[in-house]
Amino acid sequence: MTPPNQTVFVAWHAEQPMPRWAAVARLDCLYSELGDRRFRFSYTEGARTIEGFRPLDGMEDLHQVYESTSLFPVFKNRLLPASRPEFRQFLEWNGFDPDDPPEPLLLLGRSEGIRKTDAIEVFPKPMPDSHGCFVNFFFVHGIRFQPTAAERISHLHPGDSLTVRREPENPIDPHAIALEANGSMLGYTPRYLARDIERLLSQCPAETVRVTVQQVNLDAPLQQRLLCRMNACWPAGFQPCDTVDYQPISSLVPR
């Protein structure tokens, strides 16, 4: 059976002189009927509109579509090598079985491909599951800014429900989605999910939208401390990641 095609988006962010964030590219893993795999990289409209963005090394032409039979070095370098002794722990933190490693794009999207040396973030394009529902796994962001969050997280268990709360008055991002446990602030959903979650909260029956603890990684850095799972309905006509900055610049890439 041919594996399904996979898509992750690439976002760029900056904090100075003011916070800004945009999707700037997409990376697809495409399979032929024979199971042959190729990777396709292309820039999106966000790369042309967000101030300060520079093209990735080796892929400087915003209008070009880049293809390769192996993962591009700029993304391969964002994955921990399998030869490293901590690789098994890295897979476990991300919710994968170390004895059955996932496809590289699945791991890249789950781990977000974050490096301290740049402002790039990688995340998966949400797709409906086999039941036609929205299911997404993500790490809680912003834990370090909440004074009691780390201690509160240490008492959570898989399956615990979290409260999802909009923050329209948030001065940084009016689309921010906060996460709480028994009234205690833990952090936020990733920014790349916030607008879609807003729509799901508006269009899905309240009982179908749930965020639960998938696992707590007490020995992990804060950015990988709390892995959550979100379940929701998939409304008719719902298209995640459909704002202008997600649209491909090249006409050779399907929208």
Predicted features and spans:
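Conserved active-site motif detector
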Residues: 1-255
